[in-house]
Regions:
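Glycosyltransferase specificity loop/lid
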Residues: 1-478
Length: 478
């Protein structure tokens, strides 16, 4: 087979970024026996439940995991600056990467760096190795990032003017429709050190040989065509559709959930889940409960306890969910609904009884839902999720809106949040779960399921794109 070489993958900390990076790594080594991949792992102090996922892959040929996490003392010292902690945490691992490479005898073919790990381009350059970016979000968000990077750096525009602006809409390359300023990600409009660091990273994307995007041509044709900055490789949907994952549920917990779903009619259950960081205060939980009960639909609800005020932590589990639910709710919805803690999301979305997904619109969750043909009702919380919601509802027609402009502070700043009323939630659920000809969204989601599957098969658009990437990587060593 010729020269053998090693690709170095450096994902950002956190399960969503790690798992999608590892899934693309698996695709690459399955396509070309000349390549092996070392995944360098940086773990945040908070537990993202990734260890069982890594262990499940420990025997995969030509795929190696190396923990390069800095010591607790270094990590704790960095945590004192909340605003720049994440980027500084990644930068603190540069010497660890150098040490790994110095002790490795591999023939290096390139670095594949998470979108937040551009500081590692410096290390790649030191070793005279090509770099690629793995952009874990979608093409529309990449187009927005490049547009705002250009506004800020080339045209000296103070983009904070769009926050609470009288200008309701702006034009952004990658979007067919005018874009509402109220849906702009916070990173696009604030002037913090964190935002500067983020756009410095976007600038550095242009130093690399190409950008892998977790999307596919049939899903985002307009956004992909708008990206002319450099080589773009749409390689998605890259999702973990197996049983292994975050490893938060015991086998018995998952079996109990699946058994309950087995007893429900096809496409009859609305599934509510808001990602690894998603939780709500008691008042909002009660509004959701009222909406579910009034809608009459069967439901499976991942309900998790918010972290303590002022703490950057993952949500926890309730000892008794009755403490936050309307009195008698559990009894009145017995047999119709089931409340769970952490959700085995793939096992649920792949089940035929699930007919709709109320989601925070994290991109991995969106791709999982579309991979199984499940329509979405949008309820974004943070990061670029408001933009994802807008794209799904207005650009692609693959979702209905509960909210698109909802924002929840998850960094412990205790900023006030809106309460979404039960009427608004119920209306969105009814649209999502409507039967037959009334539900154009469901029809489109089923069509996108087929297109997403075809994209990854031999002859498909993402299969071809991944092949071009592998050719480029191999050219680095030939």
């Amino acid at each position: 087979m010729g020269t053998k070489a090693d690709l170095i993958f450096i994902p950002s900390p956190g399960a969503g970024h790690l798992i999608s990076a590892v899934e693309i790594a698996k695709l690459i080594i399955n396509r070309d026996e000349r390549l092996s991949i070392s995944v360098l792992i940086m773990k945040l102090p908070m537990d993202f439940g990734i260890q069982s996922y890594i262990q499940s892959l420990s025997s995969t040929p030509r795929l190696h995991f190396v923990d390069i996490t800095v010591d607790d003392e270094t990590s704790s010292a960095l945590l004192s600056n909340k605003e720049s902690y994440f980027m500084n945490f990644i930068q603190a691992h540069k010497q660890k990467v150098r040490d790994f490479l110095n002790n490795s005898n591999s023939n290096l073919a390139g670095f594949v760096l998470d979108m937040f790990c551009t500081s590692m381009i410096d290390v790649a350059n030191e070793f005279d190795v090509a770099s690629y970016i793995f952009f874990t979000s979608n093409a529309a968000f990449l187009a927005l990032c490049f547009h705002f990077e250009s506004l800020r750096k080339e045209h000296q525009v103070d983009t904070s003017k769009y926050r609470d602006s009288d200008q309701e809409f702006i034009t952004i390359p990658g979007f067919k429709n005018l874009y509402p300023t109220k849906f702009l990600p916070v990173l696009a409009t604030d002037q913090t050190a964190r935002t500067k660091m983020f756009f410095d990273s976007v600038t550095r994307f242009k130093e690399t040989k190409g950008i892998l995007i977790n999307t596919f041509a049939e899903l985002e044709p307009f956004a992909i065509q708008s990206l002319s900055v450099q080589k773009i490789y749409p390689v998605g949907p890259v999702v973990n559709l197996g049983e292994e994952g975050h490893g938060r549920n015991s086998q018995s917990e998952t079996e109990s959930i699946v058994k309950w779903l087995d007893e429900q009619p096809e496409s009859s259950v609305v599934f509510l889940c808001f990602g690894s960081m998603g939780s709500f205060d008691t008042q909002q939980v009660k509004e959701i409960a009222i909406a579910l009960e009034c809608s009459g639909y069967r439901f499976l609800w991942s309900l998790r306890r918010p972290p303590p005020k002022g703490k950057i932590e993952l949500p926890g589990e309730y000892e008794d969910v009755r403490e936050v639910l309307p009195e008698g709710f559990i009894e009145r919805t017995n047999g119709v609904g089931k409340i769970i803690g952490w959700a085995p999301q793939v096992a649920i979305l792949s089940h035929p009884s699930v007919g709709g997904f109320v989601s925070h619109c994290g991109w991995n969750s969106v791709l999982e839902s579309l991979s199984f043909g499940v329509p979405i009702a949008t309820w974004p919380l943070y990061a670029e999720q408001q933009m994802n919601a807008f794209e799904l509802v207005r650009e692609l027609g693959l979702a209905v809106e509960i909210r698109m402009d909802y924002f929840k502070d998850f960094e412990g700043n205790n900023e006030p949040v809106d309460i979404v009323g039960a009427d608004e939630i119920e209306r969105g659920i009814r649209q999502l779960m409507a039967d037959g000809d009334q539900n154009e969204i469901r029809k489109k989601a089923k069509e996108m399921k087929e297109k997403s599957s075809e994209a990854m098969k031999e002859g498909g658009s993402s299969y071809a794109s991944l092949g071009l990437l592998i050719q480029d990587v191999i050219s680095n060593i030939s």
